[in-house]
């Protein structure tokens, strides 16, 4: 792994660990703080809202100051959030700690993804992007089991040492990064910045909306798939944890193979196909239930497609505004966090009036809408794209980082 990639990978692992730490400990936190599980769960909402708001300001900062400072600030803020959460004596302070964590997560995710565009030459970003996207699954595969073990053996408060330790590693990697500043990116004078630049560009705007819709559908599935397994197949929570880990492994595998796929197939078509494939499998998973092994195989296949879609789409997003990777990836962070909230809300509303079968078709419709939106996004890497010639003479200078 090339040295500049290490801080980017650690930043996304740290961000995801800061997000998912609540999943295994939410019941214990409620018992200790004398609060309901639903009340404690609002910490995830607070984190998401904070990350969305913070992303409005983080994108321009990355484009002005570079990736490295935001990686460091994000690691420090996420570490502080973990400490504040661990020592919180009551629910209000516990929720308040999520504001600090959410700001750190926004920095880590936005800068982590923007670093691929800022630190790697054009044409060499697909493989690093696969590592950065796939790194998020490490927290589910390794981090959550460790958090659960620490919670059972000692306390949920000590469990926050897991994301805290990863944040320390991310901070050290950022400080030791060989890249001092993203000097290779030259922005034209007077160019708009931040999310304003994103939403005034038609193609970048379509890409952002496509990500929002896709994350809403994907998150609705992730939020309720555990309940689906339990209610449909009467399996234990422990078994559900294993089943979800299988999906995370599939996601990681596919992110690392996306670079080779984008060399063989047109990137935009690959994203559209993966989105439609995800939607079709979601509909089948929640309507055809002969055996848990059958569902697990479909879930594995869907997670493979999710990894391909996420990795290829992130690269496409960076190419929308090559001179402003911070702004584009801040819009990705905002779309993802809003998607988490919308997905949980929409899924809950559907299940309140229908069942999992209907939810599957709703998610199919969502992924189809995302695919339609992506189909209208310009791909500078594609021959014949209206941005193709502009991409060749973009403000991104050829560069190599050892």
What are these regions (language model features)?
Residues 179-208, 398:
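Juxtamembrane intracellular "pre-TM" segments in multi-pass secondary transporters
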Residues 99-136:
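Cytoplasmic helix-loop-helix junction between adjacent transmembrane helices
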Residues 54-66, 254-266, 351:
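Helix-to-loop junctions at the C-terminal end of transmembrane segments
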Residues 123, 130-178:
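Helix-loop-helix hairpin linking two adjacent transmembrane segments in secondary transporters
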């Amino acid at each position: 792994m090339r040295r500049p990639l290490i801080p980017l990978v650690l930043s996304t692992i740290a961000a995801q660990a800061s997000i998912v730490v609540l999943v295994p400990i939410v019941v214990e936190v409620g018992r200790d703080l004398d609060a309901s599980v639903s009340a404690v769960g609002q910490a995830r909402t607070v984190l998401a809202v904070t990350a969305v708001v913070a992303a409005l300001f983080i994108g321009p900062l990355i484009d002005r100051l570079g990736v490295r400072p935001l990686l460091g600030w994000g690691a420090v803020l996420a570490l502080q959030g973990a400490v504040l959460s661990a020592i919180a004596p009551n629910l209000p302070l516990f929720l308040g700690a999520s504001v600090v964590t959410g700001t750190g997560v926004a920095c880590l995710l936005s800068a982590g993804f923007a670093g691929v565009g800022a630190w790697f030459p054009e044409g060499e970003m697909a493989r690093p992007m696969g590592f950065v996207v796939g790194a998020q699954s490490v927290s589910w595969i390794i981090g959550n089991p460790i958090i659960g073990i620490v919670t059972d053996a000692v306390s949920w408060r000590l469990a926050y040492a897991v994301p805290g330790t990863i944040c320390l590693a991310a901070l050290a990697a950022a400080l030791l990064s060989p890249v001092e500043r993203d000097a290779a990116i030259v922005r034209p004078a007077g160019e708009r910045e931040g999310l304003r630049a994103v939403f005034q560009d038609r193609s970048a705007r379509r890409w952002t909306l496509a990500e929002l819709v896709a994350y809403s559908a994907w998150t609705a599935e992730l939020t309720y798939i555990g309940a689906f397994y339990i209610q449909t197949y009467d399996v234990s929570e422990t078994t559900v944890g294993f089943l979800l880990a299988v999906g995370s492994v599939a996601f990681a595998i596919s992110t690392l193979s996306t670079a080779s796929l984008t060399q063989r197939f047109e990137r935009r078509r690959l994203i559209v196909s993966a989105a439609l494939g995800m939607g079709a499998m979601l509909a089948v998973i929640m309507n055809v239930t002969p055996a848990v092994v059958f569902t697990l195989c479909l879930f594995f296949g869907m997670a493979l497609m999710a990894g391909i879609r996420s990795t290829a789409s992130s690269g496409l997003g960076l190419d929308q505004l090559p001179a402003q990777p911070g702004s584009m990836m801040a819009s990705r962070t905002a779309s993802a966090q809003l998607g988490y909230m919308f997905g949980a809300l929409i899924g809950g509303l559907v299940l309140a009036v229908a069942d999992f079968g209907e939810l599957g078709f709703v998610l199919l419709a969502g992924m189809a809408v995302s695919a339609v939106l992506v189909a209208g996004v310009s791909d500078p890497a594609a021959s014949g794209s209206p941005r193709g010639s502009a991409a060749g003479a973009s403000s991104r200078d050829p560069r190599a980082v050892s």
